[in-house]
């Protein structure tokens, strides 16, 4: 029997097929299981803390992958980049009311896709935050042998 939360995400997926304007997208999946989850998110440009303004997903494969994408979008609503970075497979599985071990990979795929989208968003935000054309570069490493 499906958990009520999982069934709800399957019946009415949140943000399925929606790609926000100026979206940063991350995808995860593979040939091993045939599942693919793509998470897209857009940042609020007026938000100093990097609040997520909109999110959507697309998924193919098993129903658990679809539900995990939907649950991820639900968890992203109103979150900042930092809060979203704390969302992992455990939080996604919990949002679905738990997943059996053979379906846990769906939450892991959604988490991986989310973190790839967040990486893209962080890079975009860093480019937008450049002030005065100055760039500071920090380097570490050994002594130049030349």
Model region roles, listed by residue range:
Residues 35-45:
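Short beta-strand elements
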Residues 128-146:
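ATP-dependent adenylation/nucleotidyltransferase module used to activate substrates
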Residues 33, 59-68, 106, 110:
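Short, thiol/selenol-centered motifs that function as redox-active sites or metal-ligating centers
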């Amino acid at each position: 029997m499906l958990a009520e939360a999982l069934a709800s995400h399957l019946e009415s997926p949140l943000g399925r097929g929606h790609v926000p304007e100026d979206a940063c997208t991350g995808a995860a999946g593979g040939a091993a299981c045939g599942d693919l989850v793509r998470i897209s998110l857009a940042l609020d440009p007026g938000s100093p803390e990097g609040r997520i303004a909109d999110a959507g997903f697309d998924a193919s494969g098993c129903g658990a992958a679809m539900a995990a994408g939907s649950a991820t979008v639900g968890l992203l609503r109103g979150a900042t980049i930092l809060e979203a970075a704390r969302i992992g497979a455990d939080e996604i599985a919990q949002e679905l009311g738990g997943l059996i071990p053979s379906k846990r990979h769906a939450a892991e795929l959604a988490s991986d896709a989310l973190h790839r989208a967040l990486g893209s968003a962080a890079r975009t935000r860093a480019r937008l935050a450049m002030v005065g054309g100055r760039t500071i570069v920090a380097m570490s490493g050994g002594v130049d042998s030349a």
